[in-house]
């Protein structure tokens, strides 16, 4: 996780059942060190959830800040690669495990303003499928969950900390709660160990992908 205060709160709630680390997934060496130094009771990772990700900018490609684009690439792509590369060898050695990569419908459908964010999530989609193919013969499951509108801090982060942005963006919509999305992930994990949910795409009923843009000359 990124925020020590939230991790401390969880540790107080769950006690010795939880081990926490403040970690920047963009830092390859820090990720490797974190995984290598886990306490014995937590060293054998059976489930990996690559959930770190963000969207910045949201304007036209040529007008957005290049630093924002590189931050998305570092977090959404390199972060997934760093953590998976550190954790997967142990899963292969034990011949069991489940990797969940959190993608987005933005990586499947075109959305203006999403050229970089959507591309990073397209990477997550194909990385999941290719990794799944490479692991054929191992008892390791690999799944990508691709949500639409979920009630997280996604919009607030994109809006540079504007806490009112979420309400404006989702005004009049009933969106998926974080708990509901967690239930979907747990469902995929709870399937029999020989059953792999490759791709799970989910949206609230108030959202779909039917956005066709037409330009007309005047």
Q: PLM features: residue spans?
A:
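C-terminal helical subdomain
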Residues: 144-148, 163-211
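Active-site helix of classical SDR
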Residues: 84, 120
